[in-house]
């Protein structure tokens, strides 16, 4: 028996990464189920919200974090499924079937990741109160509840909107806040965009990441990942599942089933761990300074002598400090940093191996081949193929239970 054909409107901003992932989840449900839907996705749907009641389709899946969309759909004559953030107060949920990203679980995952690194101080970089971003306040409330319940103090700063005309003022205020914090400290940012702003300001004021401040964002936005010198750790939201579950829910409603009375909460996918939270409790300030320089410059082909010049101590002095703190030499630290970068690029990019060798500071492709043979008994190509054939997540991606 064939499914009845339906016309479904998606009210999302396809220019946003979060929305695109949700839309992809809806599309995947179409591909894997028997639904026969025509999907309508307008680029400028906000300009036509007032005429939504004239639409003669069969169902709507919409971004209910947007108050204008909520208002426009109050008198909708077709089944509506809302997608948005979760709320601690059940009374805050809209009066429609609702699929929510679990804000408390997102913050919990970020907090646990930092605590597992041995971090004992916490801060939260949020966002100004905004009716279009109520999820930001929910995440702030969640981090305060979690840290207090575990016996930790949490420093909170909402900051200001980041705009070109107020950039200097906003950056100065953020820098002042960062300088006031005790270190070492772990900072949870409300989004990857705010986390990237943190990393930029830390770089400007000479705050060492992650030794003094470990930073983790929320979204795992690829753009934010590549726009900072230090790669950003982030909690990956279950956006794909949000879309998939919303489509499944609407499908059931169109078949006459009653929707659930409670919202469906979607947990985060995982924590993608990168340099910004690669915290190791280093007490020696000279080693900490050297580590910062090595992270920033290892792939530029630096030698031990340049590290010594940067730190300003003798080789024997710094080598002894390194062996005590890190268990190996300065040269090994440089080598490990380059190798780790090469491994990540082989796993996560489609760059040619020759280009990766160049980017990671190896004198030649043949040299990188020799390094991989020595460490993994594989060529770079064999290493890449093995990683792609591995069904398990990258060893630097921690699954959230």
Each language-model region and where it sits:
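C-terminal end segment of the histidine kinase catalytic
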Residues: 368, 392-399
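Short Lys/Arg-enriched helix C-cap and helix-to-coil transition segments
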Residues: 332-334, 383-385, 397
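Residue-level signature of transmembrane alpha-helix interfaces in integral membrane proteins
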Residues: 235, 377, 393-395
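Recognition helix of helix-turn-helix DNA-binding domains
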Residues: 329-332, 363
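A secondary-structure capping/hinge motif
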Residues: 322-329, 371-383
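Residues within the helices of the helix-turn-helix
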Residues: 305, 331, 354, 370, ...
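Bacterial carbohydrate/catabolite-sensing allosteric modules
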Residues: 1-59, 69-310, 315, 319-320, ...
């Amino acid at each position: 028996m064939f499914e009845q054909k339906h016309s479904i409107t998606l009210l999302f901003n396809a220019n946003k990464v979060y929305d695109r992932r949700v839309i992809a989840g809806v599309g995947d449900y179409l591909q894997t189920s028997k639904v026969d839907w025509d999907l309508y996705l307008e680029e400028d749907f906000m300009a036509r919200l007032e005429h939504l009641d004239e639409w003669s389709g069969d169902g709507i899946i919409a971004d209910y974090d947007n108050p204008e969309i909520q208002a426009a759909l109050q008198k909708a004559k077709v089944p509506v499924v809302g997608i948005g953030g979760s709320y601690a107060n059940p009374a805050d949920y809209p009066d429609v079937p609702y699929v929510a990203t679990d804000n408390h679980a997102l913050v919990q995952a970020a907090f646990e990741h930092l605590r597992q690194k041995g971090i004992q101080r916490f801060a939260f970089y949020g966002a100004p109160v905004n009716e279009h971003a109520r999820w930001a306040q929910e995440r702030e409330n969640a981090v305060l509840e979690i840290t207090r319940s575990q016996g930790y103090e949490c420093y909170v700063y909402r900051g200001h909107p980041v705009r070109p005309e107020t950039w200097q003022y906003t950056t100065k205020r953020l820098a002042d806040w960062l300088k006031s914090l005790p270190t070492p400290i772990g900072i949870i940012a409300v989004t990857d965009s705010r986390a990237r702003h943190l990393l930029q300001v830390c770089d400007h004021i000479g705050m060492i990441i992650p030794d003094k401040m470990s930073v983790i964002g929320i979204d795992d936005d690829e753009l934010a990942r590549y726009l900072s010198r230090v790669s950003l750790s982030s909690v990956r939201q279950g956006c794909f599942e949000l879309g998939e579950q919303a489509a499944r829910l609407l499908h059931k409603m169109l078949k006459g089933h009653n929707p659930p009375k409670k919202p469906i909460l979607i947990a985060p996918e995982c924590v993608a761990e990168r340099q910004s939270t690669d915290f190791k409790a280093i007490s020696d300030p000279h080693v900490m300074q050297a580590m910062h320089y090595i992270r920033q410059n290892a792939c530029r082909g630096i030698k031990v002598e340049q590290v010594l010049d940067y730190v300003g101590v003798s080789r024997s002095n710094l080598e002894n400090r390194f062996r005590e703190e890190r268990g190996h030499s300065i040269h090994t630290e440089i080598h490990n940093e380059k190798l780790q970068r090469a491994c990540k690029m082989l796993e996560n990019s489609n760059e040619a191996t020759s280009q990766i060798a160049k980017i990671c500071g190896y004198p030649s492709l043949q040299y990188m081949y020799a390094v991989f043979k020595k460490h993994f008994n594989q060529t770079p190509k064999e290493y890449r193929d093995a990683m792609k054939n591995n069904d398990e997540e990258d060893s630097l991606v921690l699954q959230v239970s």
